[in-house]
Amino acid sequence: MTEAWRPEDDEPRGASGPVRVRVPAKINLHLGVGPLRRDGYHELNTVYHAISIHDELTARRGDTLTLTMEGEGAGELALDESNLVIRAARALAGSTGVPPHARLHLRKQIPLAGGLAGGSADAAAALVACDALWGTGLTRDELAEIAAGLGSDVPFLIHGGTALGTGRGEAVSPVLARPTVWHWVVAVADGGLSTPVAYRELDRLRAAGAAGPPLGSTDTLLAALRQPDPRVLAAALGNDLQDAALALRPALAATLKAGEAAGALAGIVSGSGPTCVFLAAGAADAERIAAELSALDVCRQARTAHGPVAGARIG
């Protein structure tokens, strides 16, 4: 359902609302894709990393459950029962026995279908916002249990930071890492890329012997996160889905090449793509690389980000 969002709805948060939640985008520093499981998912061994590109969800009291949105992808997303935000709110209501009544408004910056888990981020934001609005008082771990039924990335985006994901990605545990800030350039492509399509393409490439060797263990990546040198982390980045994304969107090869030519320490496709992310030596280098990519015809938008950052948080 949709409902008009009025400027006066943006008053400061009071005792009963509104509740505003910011939620970050996600990249995969390591995405190892195993065989297809009987439940239709692939076994994953991944390291998630939350970065400073945020969506914002505002929840207000209402007589029904409604959703409006603005920003990235406005007009392209259905705002009905199929939307992950609505599904998340209903899942929380169903688990806690409260009426699913809220007016939700999404301000979106994370690109749609870009390999940055934008939909999963918004589901995580809805769980945190509605939990506060409805006073259901769930812990982060309890919210993450509900999140696991909504999507593989959603539990991570409840927590944020940097974490190891196993199973289909929904089993999340924090990693031991130095308190280092890593600087990234995010090159957003025109259009999105379906995650299921990317996985099917990887299966096809592997069956044809046309995919690279699987990444395997996360040990090298996890060890790199315990070092302060971004060059060590750069050498450990990897994504088994990159072959599939490049097969489906060959132009991404030029984006990766341009980023590394501009001075990035390494570049990979983010998740299932088509966004590419580049690790920079520092903040100034990231700004320079983003400016160079923006001047070329290799992406729709290049922006800087840093990580790790917190997951869905009120404020």
Swiss-Prot record:
Principal EC category: transferase
Catalysed reactions listed for this entry: 4-CDP-2-C-methyl-D-erythritol + ATP = 4-CDP-2-C-methyl-D-erythritol 2-phosphate + ADP + H(+)
InterPro entries assigned to the protein according to its UniProt record, in alphabetical order: GHMP_kinase_C_dom (IPR013750), GHMP_kinase_C_sf (IPR036554), GHMP_kinase_N_dom (IPR006204), IspE (IPR004424), Ribosomal_Su5_D2-typ_SF (IPR020568), Ribsml_uS5_D2-typ_fold_subgr (IPR014721)
Binding site for ATP: 111-121
GO molecular function: 4-(cytidine 5'-diphospho)-2-C-methyl-D-erythritol kinase activity; ATP binding
Positions annotated as active site in the UniProt record: 26, 153
Family, similarity comment: Belongs to the GHMP kinase family. IspE subfamily.
Keywords, comma-separated and alphabetical: ATP-binding, Isoprene biosynthesis, Kinase, Nucleotide-binding, Transferase
Species name: Salinispora tropica (strain ATCC BAA-916 / DSM 44818 / JCM 13857 / NBRC 105044 / CNB-440)
Listed name of the protein: 4-diphosphocytidyl-2-C-methyl-D-erythritol kinase
Keyword ATP-binding: yes
EC number: 2.7.1.148
Known function: Catalyzes the phosphorylation of the position 2 hydroxy group of 4-diphosphocytidyl-2C-methyl-D-erythritol.
GO process annotations (BP): isopentenyl diphosphate biosynthetic process, methylerythritol 4-phosphate pathway; terpenoid biosynthetic process
Pathway info: Isoprenoid biosynthesis; isopentenyl diphosphate biosynthesis via DXP pathway; isopentenyl diphosphate from 1-deoxy-D-xylulose 5-phosphate: step 3/6
Gene3D superfamilies named among the record's database cross-references: 3.30.230.10, GHMP kinase, C-terminal domain
